[in-house]
Swiss-Prot record:
A Gene Ontology cellular-component term: cytosolic large ribosomal subunit
Originating species: Picosynechococcus sp. (strain ATCC 27264 / PCC 7002 / PR-6) (Agmenellum quadruplicatum)
Xref: Pfam families: Ribosomal_L12, Ribosomal_L12_N
Membrane-spanning segments: none
Name listed for the protein in its UniProt record: Large ribosomal subunit protein bL12
Record-annotated disulphide pairs: none
PANTHER family given in the database record: 39S RIBOSOMAL PROTEIN L12, LARGE RIBOSOMAL SUBUNIT PROTEIN BL12M
Family: Belongs to the bacterial ribosomal protein bL12 family.
Keywords for this protein: Ribonucleoprotein, Ribosomal protein
Entry's Gene Ontology molecular function annotations: mRNA binding; structural constituent of ribosome
Length: 128
């Protein structure tokens, strides 16, 4: 640190609590700022309001494989392998254990594209 900041720091350390409070008040008035710590403004919001806000700001989506008809399993399996990069065994287990998330925390456009691929292969999918 520079000599100036070292001096200021030493002087601040020597202040009494009353002097520190006066200094804070003067800084607030001089610079037009508030030294009050945020008191959980977002945390204090009502649960219903937080849920509504979350829906508006949602940027990450999960693609859920809801259902796979038996006669479409192989086609869906190929699509799932392509999307996830999983091996045959893991992809097969995923397809057979539907409903199951296929892709999590992806953008809206990607999620819709993946959903369309799955539906084109014969599966029922949803974006959440």
């Amino acid at each position: 640190m520079s000599a100036t900041t070292d001096e200021i720091l030493e002087k601040l350390q020597s202040l009494t609590l009353l002097e520190a409070a006066e200094l804070v008040k003067q800084i607030e008035e001089t610079f037009g700022v508030s030294a009050a710590a945020p008191v959980g403004g977002m945390v204090m919001a009502a649960p219903g309001a937080a849920a509504a806000e979350e829906v508006e700001e949602k940027t990450e989506f999960d693609v859920i494989l809801d259902e796979v008809p038996a006669d479409k399993k192989i086609a869906v399996l190929k699509v799932v392998r392509g999307i996830t990069g999983l091996g045959l065994k893991e992809a097969k287990e995923m397809v057979e254990s539907a409903p199951k998330p296929i892709k999590e925390a992806t953008g809206k456009e990607d999620a819709e594209a993946i959903k369309k691929q799955l539906e084109d292969a014969g599966a029922k999918a949803s974006v959440k």
